[in-house]
């Protein structure tokens, strides 16, 4: 068993995903209405986490939006990243966290995020072995991708509001790709 003091911590922020095969690494994130899906293949000894802001894309990915904030994109990236590291789809298992209702509005984005993640995993045939979603407070999540161990800490009201402020900040748009071709 890896001592927590010796574990190397890798922080996952909104719009990111990481795939790890090192038992001494713990992935960590802070969630409000966002959701983190933690997937692993226990036989291959590889796992990962993503952190998404919204469930799906309202418009085409070619419309110039930042696809990394959407669950549909990050779920595919995480699964493909695991497969590239030797995982097999039929051995994947998932844990899902987040999706709190952090803002009093008619729309509950957190609930939509959590429902999206659960439906996506169900559609892909990936069993959810554990989940902690919903509520009114954010959470800090730690996930050891090789062992599958996960731990969460509830955030206070003030901490949740800080997380809400971060989630509402616009994600930096990726630099435009230069489509020009230069011939030598």
UniProtKB/Swiss-Prot annotation:
The lineage of its organism: Bacteria, Pseudomonadati, Pseudomonadota, Alphaproteobacteria, Hyphomicrobiales. HAMAP family: CheD. The keyword Hydrolase applies. It is an enzyme of class 3 (hydrolase). It catalyses: L-glutaminyl-[protein] + H2O = L-glutamyl-[protein] + NH4(+). The keyword Hydrolase applies. Probably deamidates glutamine residues to glutamate on methyl-accepting chemotaxis receptors (MCPs), playing an important role in chemotaxis. Keywords: Chemotaxis, Hydrolase. Belongs to the CheD family. Pfam families: CheD (PF03975). GO terms for molecular function: protein-glutamine glutaminase activity. GO terms for biological process: chemotaxis. Its EC number is 3.5.1.44. It comes from Rhizobium rhizogenes (strain K84 / ATCC BAA-868) (Agrobacterium radiobacter). The gene is cheD. This is Probable chemoreceptor glutamine deamidase CheD. InterPro entries: CheD-like_sf, Chemorcpt_Glu_NH3ase_CheD, Cytotoxic_necrot_fac-like_cat.
